[in-house]
């Protein structure tokens, strides 16, 4: 009787920037015959997305420690203790062969308990500036991976492999092939994230209204559920036509359609823009911890594939001046530069590392 296939425990939660790379890894591991379980929280985006992917979700009662009030800080040791105990129970019950952490609230307690029980622990940091949890876990992890260079000190021994992105994005045709027959007005994609971005919703339509009507690009704008009405009103008042939705379900199709994207600079977004091969105007979220979105954007700005405008500096005049001077031929050059920086094999490299970390007596079952 053959042994069951290896069980890999993915730890990620809180935001899509942590969860989507974890889901990409889970899909790659399943294709290789592995079983996958997930450790997260009940309040993060993983509570919906992970069960929808058919993955068993285990949750910890923990929240972030940074930027909290005094009461939350005083209760933090108690909350952490409960979460460590809950993580220990999960580890003992599941007995995973390998544990992989992507960051987020549950990753800290889970990673500590995995290490204490001698389970191989792998850590992947998505941002150019490593988050607090991953900085801690990097000290005890068996292997550390990153989406951008220099996220950790050299002493950590980190491998830069890029960020896992969804296959449908990596599989898009190269920019030159996609744009070969395009004529007429430019195609502008505006992504405010699933929750929207108030600055983009207000400034983009005002900037477009400053352009002659015949020179305005075709626009698709993801406004977010909370700020959809604001965006609809802003475009209406500006007299600018646009396709405005709360959320774009098929983002790969939207990337394939666009000539240019205006967006925040979360690690996953930057990785997807590179994988798709798109020039971008990044507007980093101004309240991101350690200003990591500016560092993320710098990866493609340095490559000559993108622009970066700080949120406070994004005015209709500045954005309108930039958009008014763009031509598709010049954008294609930036698109190809972006595609050259992509790491389409990131998820396969990470999946291979997981299997290599499986104890030898279990590896044959994969």
Per-segment meaning from a language model:
Residues 5-13, 30-82, 225-227, 310-312:
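Conserved nucleotide-sugar phosphate-binding/catalytic loop shared by glycosyltransferases and other
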Residues 18-29:
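Short amphipathic alpha-helix
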Residues 35, 45, 56, 115-175:
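Active-site-proximal region of nucleotide-activated glycan assembly enzymes
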Residues 44, 49, 53, 174-261, ...:
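Donor-nucleotide binding loops and adjacent catalytic segments primarily
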Residues 86-100, 107-122, 135-140:
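Glycosyltransferases and closely related glycan-assembly transferases
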Residues 96-98, 256-270, 278-279:
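Acidic donor-binding loop of glycosyltransferase active sites
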Residues 331-344:
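A short, well-ordered alpha-helix in the C-terminal region of glycosyltransferases
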Residues 343-366:
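C-terminal alpha-helical cap of glycosyltransferases
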């Amino acid at each position: 009787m053959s042994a069951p296939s290896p069980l890999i425990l993915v730890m990620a939660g809180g935001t899509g920037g942590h969860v989507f790379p974890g889901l990409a890894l889970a899909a790659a591991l399943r294709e290789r015959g592995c079983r996958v379980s997930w450790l997260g929280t009940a309040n993060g985006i993983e509570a919906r997305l992970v069960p929808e992917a058919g993955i068993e979700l285990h949750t910890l009662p923990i929240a972030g420690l940074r930027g909290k009030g005094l009461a939350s800080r005083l209760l933090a040791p108690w909350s952490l203790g409960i979460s460590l105990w809950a993580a220990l129970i999960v580890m003992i019950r599941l007995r995973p062969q390998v544990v992989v952490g992507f960051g987020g609230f549950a990753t800290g307690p889970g990673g500590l308990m995995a290490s204490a029980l001698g389970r191989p622990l792998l850590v992947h940091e998505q941002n150019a500036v490593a988050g607090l949890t991953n900085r801690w876990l990097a000290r005890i992890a068996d292997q550390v991976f990153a989406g951008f260079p220099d996220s950790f000190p050299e002493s950590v021994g980190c491998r830069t492999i890029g960020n896992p992105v969804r296959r449908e994005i990596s599989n898009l045709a190269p920019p030159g092939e996609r744009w070969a027959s395009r004529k007429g007005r430019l195609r502008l994609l505006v992504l405010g994230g699933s929750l929207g971005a108030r600055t983009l919703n207000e400034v983009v339509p005002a900037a477009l209204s400053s352009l002659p009507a015949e020179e305005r690009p075709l626009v698709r704008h993801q406004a977010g559920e909370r700020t959809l009405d604001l965006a609809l009103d802003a475009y209406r008042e500006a007299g600018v036509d646009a396709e405005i939705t709360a959320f774009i379900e098929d983002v790969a199709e939207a990337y394939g359609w666009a000539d240019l994207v205006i967006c925040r600079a979360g690690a996953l977004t930057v990785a997807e823009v590179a994988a798709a091969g798109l020039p971008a105007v990044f507007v980093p979220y101004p309240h991101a911890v350690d200003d990591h979105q500016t560092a993320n954007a710098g990866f493609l700005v340095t490559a000559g594939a993108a622009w970066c405008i700080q949120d406070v500096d994004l005015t209709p005049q500045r954005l309108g001046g930039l958009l008014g001077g763009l031509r598709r031929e010049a954008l294609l050059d930036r698109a190809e530069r972006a595609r050259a920086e992509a790491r389409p094999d990131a998820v396969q490299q990470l999946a291979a590392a997981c299997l290599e970390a499986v104890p030898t007596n279990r590896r044959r079952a994969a």
